[in-house]
């Protein structure tokens, strides 16, 4: 390790010894000129010097930055004799910027030290005052004790000696007067002392307050200076492009030296350029003074125009740095609005979306998810706005703070089509609802409640056809117990498996009713084995599911099924709030021609009364009338009771929640908000076009479309039929539901069908008189159905008629060339023997040589014994002339075929 003296170090670095000693002292090292300096001390000195000069290249954090600036300009002065000359003027400026944190730390440290010193002085003064008070109190006690002792001794002497009483009394009075004067003097001294202490304390507090204010003022000045410096640094950083004539010197910084060299080089290049003319100098002088500048055109040019003086031109440039901010995004947003929130141009947003694979325009509505991805891609923080505050406020304003009471179970009857679900329910209700359903199959959700000896049960009867998947799912979601009806002769079928999946997804217990046990081919054990494959295990096998063998036709074990249902409900301990505002679910809805929108609502909690204001999805209204499943008028309905309500503004969607609210105006606002949000979200999803789908969309132009206007009696049927028809679409024919709704067929539907070249399908509905006239006038295809099987089959037939036909080539004859003749009219004539089938005139043919097709064309001439014939059968000779072909050789085969059109169907 090499060590030098301070003097040697000063000679080595070229610094005076006194200056070096001062720098060492500032760095915390007191040295003399003859002391040794180690490498660690050198490093410490270097770090201190870097810190003093604001160098950030080392480990020390810079605290100061010194900038030098030179500005050159040209001034035109009068040189006498009417001449002027240009004088170069150079202005040099030097500024030192101190880092904000260092100033704040120093001010804070000074304030802390001052506060500590004041606290120590205050503690010291308090200790001195306490000691002084103790000394004074001790002196006072000693004086009192001494006076007391003297008085006692005097009294004792008076009693003992019995001397002259007058002299003693006089002495006593003198002593008392002296003691009194001493006490008064002490009181005066104590008051003076306290007054002096109070004055001193006030002076100290005033000094302390002034010191704190001075410290705070210095701190604020330092903070303001730091903020100003920060703004200047930011401005200098942003305006780097305007610094060609500016020279910055940052000491001990490599990057600063490089910038300095670059600036000098540019300055030298500028100096070599041609000097400005006198007119340009005057123009620049006018610009500096804010005077007008006139640009005059040449000969024949336009007149000059006054340009704005420099003082009137704005000096603000658009920031090149994109401001990162929080972007609030709602359910949907327009592309231009999203760009405004991010403070960028809409074209930038569209570019980002195109890179992400989404095509959009400036006025297009995009959904929340897409907008969030775009904003995060551009570096912004996204805040998703909750727009349903009014909805939550309306739904939370309810008076359901009542005690829950036991309620009846809601049981859903599910199973495969024609397994006896409705028949089982019929026997329970002692009615014949199945005969009222077209084709004997259930096509709606029937909601009924029945009274048994052990209690009330509410039943939901769901369709078993494959088209009614959504209706079965809704039935499972709104239920407490699922009764799975399985025919003992058929076993497990596709809709049986689907019902099991719905029940498991809803998390409700499953009771299996094995029906049709009265049939000879019934096999209940086989049903158990098949259901065990889907984790439906009977209790006797150690499972959790109860099995009941019933016969809906004869009523066997129906009572046992009801007891099993009530037993399962008792285990579940089903409760609900009976009083208060009602809430439930829309099981089914339809548009009645005489009564308007009708919704079947299953009340789940509270009591629904006539006159209540009900909010159902996008619809609302006051309950004008309520009917039970039989059709009787009722005034109220409690939990687990299904009722039909009238008075809604429109037909609600099946599965919507029905809630009683207080204010009709707020209910209307919530319904309108839901409808608007539904439209916006639907539009945003429809307009979402991906780049990867562009070519498939182009190819879709060749696809035939079957447009359909669908009307049905209830909402569930519309949903089921539309879903089934949409699934019929193939690559060649697409089913397009241009319009659907609940209720009869109106003239509006006919106009829509005419405009879109569609057919009208009515399911359990009819067209009114005006609609029939419009349909006949436009020759629109109108069809009525009451069974969903027939509707789907006929739509398949219509789609089959739109398929492009297939063509098949069938070989009808084969002839062998035995000889070739020349004809002046027809050219080469092949003398042939028909070996297979028959040969027809004007039929397409192929010429085969060594079983290889060498020509395909048309048979032009067919003769037998110089007579033209239409056809020649197998085993006969004939002459064949091939159209536009003369290279027929002996041994060739002529194959005759015909093209057959094959009719295609939709499977």
Swiss-Prot record:
Name the record gives this protein: Translation initiation factor IF-2
Biological role stated in the UniProt entry: One of the essential components for the initiation of protein synthesis. Protects formylmethionyl-tRNA from spontaneous hydrolysis and promotes its binding to the 30S ribosomal subunits. Also involved in the hydrolysis of GTP during the formation of the 70S ribosomal complex.
InterPro entries, per database record: DNA-bd_dom_put_sf, EF-G-like_DII, EFTu-like_2, IF2_assoc_dom_bac, IF2_II, IF2_N, P-loop_NTPase, Small_GTP-bd
Basic and acidic residues bias (residue ranges): 28-44, 101-248
Region feature G5, mapped onto this chain: 551-553
Keyword Plastid: no
Residues bound to GTP: 415-422, 461-465, 515-518
SUPFAM superfamilies xrefs: Initiation factor IF2/eIF5b, domain 3, P-loop containing nucleoside triphosphate hydrolases, Putative DNA-binding domain, Translation proteins
Start and end residues of each stretch annotated as G1: 415-422
Region called Disordered, residue ranges: 26-317
Presence of keyword Protein biosynthesis: yes
Residue ranges of the region described as G3: 461-464
Organism in which the protein naturally occurs: Vibrio vulnificus (strain CMCP6)
Gene3D superfamilies attached to this UniProt entry: P-loop containing nucleotide triphosphate hydrolases, Putative DNA-binding domain, N-terminal subdomain of bacterial translation initiation factor IF2, Translation factors, Translation initiation factor IF- 2, domain 3
Source lineage: Bacteria, Pseudomonadati, Pseudomonadota, Gammaproteobacteria, Vibrionales
């Amino acid at each position: 390790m090499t060590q030098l003296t301070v003097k040697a170090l000063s000679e080595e670095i070229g610094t005076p010894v006194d200056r070096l000693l001062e720098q060492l002292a500032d760095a915390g090292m007191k040295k003399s000129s003859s002391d040794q300096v180690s490498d660690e001390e050198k490093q410490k000195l270097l770090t201190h010097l870097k810190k003093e000069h604001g160098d950030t290249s080392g480990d020390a954090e810079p605290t100061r930055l010194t900038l030098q600036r030179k500005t050159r300009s040209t001034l035109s002065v009068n040189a006498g004799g009417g001449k002027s000359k240009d004088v170069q003027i150079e202005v040099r400026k030097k500024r030192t910027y101190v880092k904000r944190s260092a100033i704040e730390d120093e001010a804070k440290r000074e304030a802390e030290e001052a506060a500590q010193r004041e606290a120590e002085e205050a503690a010291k003064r308090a200790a001195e005052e306490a000691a002084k008070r103790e000394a004074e109190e001790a002196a006072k006690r000693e004086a009192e004790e001494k006076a007391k002792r003297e008085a006692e001794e005097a009294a004792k002497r008076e009693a003992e000696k019995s001397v002259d009483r007058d002299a003693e009394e006089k002495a006593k009075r003198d002593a008392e007067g002296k003691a009194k004067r001493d006490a008064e003097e002490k009181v005066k001294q104590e008051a003076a002392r306290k007054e002096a202490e109070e004055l001193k304390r006030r002076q100290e507090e005033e000094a302390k307050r002034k010191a704190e204010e001075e410290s705070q003022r210095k701190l604020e000045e330092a903070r303001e200076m730091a903020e100003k410096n920060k703004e200047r640094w930011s401005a200098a950083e942003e305006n780097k492009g305007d610094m060609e004539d500016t020279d910055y010197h940052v000491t001990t910084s490599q990057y600063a030296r490089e910038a300095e060299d670059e600036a000098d080089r540019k300055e030298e290049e500028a100096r070599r350029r041609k000097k400005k003319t006198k007119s340009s100098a005057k123009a620049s002088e006018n610009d500096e003074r804010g005077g007008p500048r006139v640009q005059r055109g040449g000969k024949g040019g336009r007149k000059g125009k006054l340009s704005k003086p420099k003082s009137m031109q704005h000096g603000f440039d658009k920031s090149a740095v994109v401001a990162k901010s929080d972007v609030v995004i709602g359910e949907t947003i327009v592309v231009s609005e999203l760009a405004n929130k991010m403070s960028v141009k809409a074209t930038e947003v569209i570019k980002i979306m195109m890179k992400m694979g989404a095509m959009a325009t400036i006025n297009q509505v995009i959904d929340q998810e897409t907008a969030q991805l775009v904003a995060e891609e551009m570096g912004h923080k996204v805040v998703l706005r909750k727009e349903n505050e009014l909805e939550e406020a309306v739904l939370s304003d309810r008076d359901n703070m009542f005690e829950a009471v036991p309620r009846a179970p809601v049981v859903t009857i599910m199973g495969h089509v024609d397994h006896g679900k409705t028949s089982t329910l019929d026997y329970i209700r002692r009615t014949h609802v199945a005969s009222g359903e077209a084709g004997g199959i259930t096509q709606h959700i029937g909601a009924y409640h029945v009274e048994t000896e052990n209690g009330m049960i509410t039943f939901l009867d769901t369709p078993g056809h494959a088209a009614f998947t959504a209706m079965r799912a809704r039935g499972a979601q709104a239920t407490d117990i699922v009764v799975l009806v399985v025919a003992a002769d058929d076993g497990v079928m596709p809709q049986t498996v689907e019902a099991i999946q719905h029940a498991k997804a809803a998390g409700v217990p499953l009771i299996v009713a094995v029906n049709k046990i009265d049939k000879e081919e019934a096999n209940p054990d086989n049903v158990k084995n098949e259901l065990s494959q889907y984790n439906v295990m009977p209790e006797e096998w150690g499972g959790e599911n109860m099995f009941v063998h019933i016969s809906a036709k004869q009523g066997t074990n129906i009572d046992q099924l009801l007891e099993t249902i009530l037993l399962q409900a008792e285990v579940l301990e089903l409760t609900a709030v009976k009083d208060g505002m009602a809430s439930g679910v829309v099981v089914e809805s339809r548009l009645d021609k005489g009564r308007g929108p009708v919704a079947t609502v299953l009340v789940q909690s509270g009591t629904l009364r006539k006159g209540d204001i009900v909010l159902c999805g996008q619809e609302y209204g006051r309950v004008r009338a309520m009917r039970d499943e039989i059709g009787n008028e009722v005034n109220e309905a409690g939990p687990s009771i299904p009722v039909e309500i009238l008075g809604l503004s429109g037909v609600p969607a099946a599965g919507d929640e029905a809630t009683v609210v207080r204010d009709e105006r707020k209910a209307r606002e919530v319904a309108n908000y839901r409808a608007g949000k539904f439209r916006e979200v639907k539009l945003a999803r429809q307009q979402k076009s991906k780049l990867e789908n562009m070519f498939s969309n182009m190819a879709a132009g060749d696809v035939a479309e079957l447009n359909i206007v669908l009307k049905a009696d209830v909402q569930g049927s519309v949903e089921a039929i539309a879903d089934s028809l949409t699934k019929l679409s193939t690559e060649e024919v697409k089913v397009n539901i241009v319009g659907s709704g609940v209720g009869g067929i109106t003239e509006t539907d006919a106009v829509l069908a005419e405009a879109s070249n569609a057919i009208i399908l009515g399911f359990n509905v009819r067209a009114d008189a005006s609609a029939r006239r419009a349909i006949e006038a436009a020759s629109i295809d109108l069809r009525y159905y009451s069974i969903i099987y027939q509707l789907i089959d006929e739509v398949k037939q219509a789609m089959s008629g739109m398929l492009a036909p297939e063509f098949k080539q069938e070989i009808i004859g084969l002839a062998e060339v035995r000889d070739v003749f020349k004809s002046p009219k027809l050219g080469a004539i092949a003398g042939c023997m028909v070996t297979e089938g028959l040969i027809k005139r004007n039929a397409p043919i192929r010429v085969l040589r060594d079983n290889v097709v060498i020509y395909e064309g048309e048979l032009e001439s067919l003769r037998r014994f110089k007579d033209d014939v239409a056809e020649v059968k197998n085993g006969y000779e004939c002459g064949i002339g091939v159209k536009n072909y003369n290279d027929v050789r002996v041994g060739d085969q002529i194959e005759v075929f015909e093209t057959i059109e094959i009719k295609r169907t939709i499977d």
